[in-house]
């Protein structure tokens, strides 16, 4: 993923509730945001539940990413904290850390997400990604302007 981003002028990221709860998505995005060369080329579409109307098949669950409120941001911190606790339980159940190597590696990744999550959410909030509905209503003018097209 990182190598493919280097080849592009801009990266448009669609942020949904599931995205913010995906280990792979969060791990990669947190790496991208740390690199100022990449972070200056990132554009966000922050999905709201209203944006589900554009799906061909209605999503089973809410898609909206609650990144603009403190309580919404806390929801994602709690989610990743719970993942961390579940790994602690698995490691404890296994008993010997030699046999829990995969769980320990996963725990390191989850802890990295937990550590970097507040900065990422603040980055998204400061860069005010519009919803898909807002982008469609204004013809993606903000993105076009950002990319100086």
Where are the predicted features?
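Conserved N-terminal substructure of TIR/SEFIR domains
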Residues: 1-11, 33-41, 138-149
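C-terminal interaction surface of TIR/SEFIR-family domains
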Residues: 49-149
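Conserved TIR/SEFIR loop-to-helix hotspot centered on a Trp-containing motif
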Residues: 17-37
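Short beta-alpha junction loops
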Residues: 17-18, 39, 44-54
